[in-house]
Amino acid sequence: MISTEGIKDLEAVDIEKLLSILPHRYPFLLIDRIVNIDGEQEAIGIKNITINEPHFTGHFPTKPVMPGVLILEAMAQTAGAIALLNLGNKRTNLVYLMTVDNAKFRKPVMPGDQLKIHVQLLKKRSGMRRFSCVAKVENVRVAEAEIAAMIVEEE
């Protein structure tokens, strides 16, 4: 179990810690690490995009582009991970996506890119969290959205 003591001082969460926090696994774990964590307030998720990912075989065969819905999922996983970190990583908790608002896709994300997902907490009420998310490649905004999620006890 990851302690929440000193979470504001935690600078990064590596893949091993992510695997202990999130239930997602290959091919659906869409973040490689989280950096610049400021408690539950904000963090940056990192996803290294490679041609070996299964969605590139069909999206699109001659010009591979990361599907926008997977960028949204990477945003949700980053937000969910920081929310769970601040609960002390209780394995009985899961984060379910509730809404996606104002999603915009500005530029394609392709193999070789490093996606940086900037997540900021907007609102916290009970088990609900609302986040502002901005995805960037080389400091250029490629996608953005507001997401809401609910933390629930796993049955």
From Swiss-Prot:
This is 3-hydroxyacyl-[acyl-carrier-protein] dehydratase FabZ. GO terms for molecular function: (3R)-hydroxyacyl-[acyl-carrier-protein] dehydratase activity. It catalyses: a (3R)-hydroxyacyl-[ACP] = a (2E)-enoyl-[ACP] + H2O. InterPro entries: FabA_FabZ, FabZ, HotDog_dom_sf. Coiled coil: none annotated. The lineage of its organism: Bacteria, Pseudomonadati, Pseudomonadota, Alphaproteobacteria, Hyphomicrobiales. GO terms for biological process: fatty acid biosynthetic process; lipid A biosynthetic process. Its EC number is 4.2.1.59. It comes from the Bacteria. The active site is at residue 59. Pfam families: FabA (PF07977). It comes from Bartonella tribocorum (strain CIP 105476 / IBS 506).
